[in-house]
């Protein structure tokens, strides 16, 4: 019997690269995505298209309301998504696009799904560039959540270890794109933008777009998605 894996899938290049990596193993894949605000609704639409390229046993989209977490540009309509011209302008501290406890919420859902379906492996696409800005993307956080998962679940208490996998944790965005291209990821079906237009164009100026464009440029490859 195949082992089961839960993958957090956002529709961006990082989680899609993780999906590609896991798809080349013997895991039976259960993908989990979240619809939490209008600004990420396009991500959910994109996922429906890209997931058809993979042998995914089940894909769940969880609707959750994170708008009560005011103070983040990704959940608060009163805060504009910051725009930049290049990587030199990107913030070195925690940006306003940080969503309080987001990965803790997402991983908690993934943990619940894993217990229900009998999975012991959870995959997430955090990486080096992420944990420069987002505290819930750091290696220490991943290790701590894994420790909590094994203390707070029936399977963990019974000695069936739950593992949180972050296969990109030591990679930069540039290295992730390089790896994905080598594996054959179709990045035209992904989106990174924090502030896309209603017709699906990426803004090209938010933190995520700037980082994505820079990663493709460093790989001497044209980003296949459309920008404003």
Swiss-Prot record:
Listed Gene3D superfamilies: HUPs
Comment on bound cofactor: Binds 1 zinc ion per subunit.
Coiled coil: none
Domain of life per record: Bacteria
Keywords: ATP-binding, Ligase, Metal-binding, Nucleotide-binding, Queuosine biosynthesis, Zinc
GO biological process, alphabetically ordered: queuosine biosynthetic process
Record-listed ATP binding positions: 9-19
Listed pathway(s): Purine metabolism; 7-cyano-7-deazaguanine biosynthesis
Keyword Glycoprotein found: no
UniProt function note: Catalyzes the ATP-dependent conversion of 7-carboxy-7-deazaguanine (CDG) to 7-cyano-7-deazaguanine (preQ(0)).
Protein name: 7-cyano-7-deazaguanine synthase
Species this chain originates from: Rickettsia africae (strain ESF-5)
Origin organism lineage: Bacteria, Pseudomonadati, Pseudomonadota, Alphaproteobacteria, Rickettsiales
